[in-house]
Amino acid sequence: MLLNLNGIRVDCVIGERPDERTRLQTLRVDVRLEIPDRAAETDALADTVDYAALAERIRAALVAARCRMIERAAKVAADVCCAEDKVTSAVVTVTKRGAVPGLESASAVCETTRKNKENE
């Protein structure tokens, strides 16, 4: 079963330039989780990922991380996702609008599995 969480908004410090290190910018985080099918059968929250709680953990992790690169932000968010017991894999896209003049947005994608996480 795939579970998508689209458009998680995170206001955090992100960027390399000195002016970016002193202000909050908004990231969009999109998450695709592979989870067991059980919740589709039981219709019970206990059998799936509490995505409201997961979104808050992603926000907190990115605020604390103060990443310079969106690539790092994507990995931080993916690690949070794979720390969930019911998640077997995660694909996380982090998008930063206005990263450079003349560019609408830049995004980084991190794909990880619980197996990859356990081998670190």
Where do the PLM segments sit?
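N-terminal, polar/charged subdomain of small-to-medium soluble alpha/beta proteins
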Residues: 1-120
